[in-house]
Amino acid sequence: MNAIEALLFAVIQGVSELFPVSSLGHGVLIPDWLHWSINRTHPDFLPFMVMLHLGTAAALLIYFRRDWVDLIGGWLKAGGRASNPHARLMWLVIAGTLPAGLLGLLLEKQLRALFASTTAVLVFLALNGLLLLWGDKLKKKTASHELSELSFAGAIKIGAGQALALLPGFSRSGATLVAGLAHGLDYASSARFSFLLATPIITAAGLLEIPKLAHRGNGSAEWGLLLACGAVSGLCAYASTWFLMRYFKKTEIESLRPFGFYCLLVGVVGLLFKLV
């Protein structure tokens, strides 16, 4: 990748990680369609992706900083017990994070290697679109609840939905948004919980790879460019979070429809072009 491609990839990562349209899917499709020379096995690609993940994680931590201060403070004040609203929500986040974290550690490399072709991505992206459209229908059939009313079993099920993102084309935020709607949350509460769940997963994805970088020596990575890409990814992720939280608060009817139709259109049209 040259510098321009790297910066554009950072924009794609920062935006599509939070929008329910699959960052991994777009990270496969767009470079392929634009004929970018990306070698994912090159030693420089790992530090590049680490910086993008850390940039996105930093954006989420900054945007939800008050939430995290309240959650951690409430949890510590309660001595780890779910005896106040903040401590209880902290436990809900922990319960929702564990399933995806464990599945990611066990299956991530195998699944991503198995389904890394553009054809597989297009199929999963179209299915992601159908999932989002189904989520809107679920919302019409379920009464809206506050996040404080979510059960621990519900949090675990919503968190498990993140595992769908191991398949390139399915969206982490999309799956958790739909799962939240299925458990009676409104769009805004579902989005907030989705982003709170994503924060430790995305942060861990970056931090767990850092020790591997120490064994690569200085290499040929241009660290100035890597830092710039991390910053670009973070800025785009922050802007995306800001937009989406306001969008879901204001749009309480069929909020997922635009994203669902977009994924379905790209997936189906992309598959048709492959057949022609």
Swiss-Prot record:
Assigned keywords, A-Z: Antibiotic resistance, Cell inner membrane, Cell membrane, Cell shape, Cell wall biogenesis/degradation, Hydrolase, Membrane, Peptidoglycan synthesis, Transmembrane, Transmembrane helix
Disulfide bonds: none
Gene Ontology molecular functions: undecaprenyl-diphosphatase activity
A GO biological process held by the record: cell wall organization
Subcellular location(s) of the protein: Cell inner membrane
Keyword Hydrolase: yes
Membrane topology label: Multi-pass membrane protein
Lineage top rank: taxon: Bacteria
One Pfam family per UniProt: BacA
Enzyme Commission number(s): 3.6.1.27
Catalyzed reactions: di-trans,octa-cis-undecaprenyl diphosphate + H2O = di-trans,octa-cis-undecaprenyl phosphate + phosphate + H(+)
Other remarks in the entry: Bacitracin is thought to be involved in the inhibition of peptidoglycan synthesis by sequestering undecaprenyl diphosphate, thereby reducing the pool of lipid carrier available.
Described function: Catalyzes the dephosphorylation of undecaprenyl diphosphate (UPP). Confers resistance to bacitracin.
Protein name as catalogued: Undecaprenyl-diphosphatase 2
Organism: Chromobacterium violaceum (strain ATCC 12472 / DSM 30191 / JCM 1249 / CCUG 213 / NBRC 12614 / NCIMB 9131 / NCTC 9757 / MK)
Gene name, Swiss-Prot/TrEMBL: uppP2
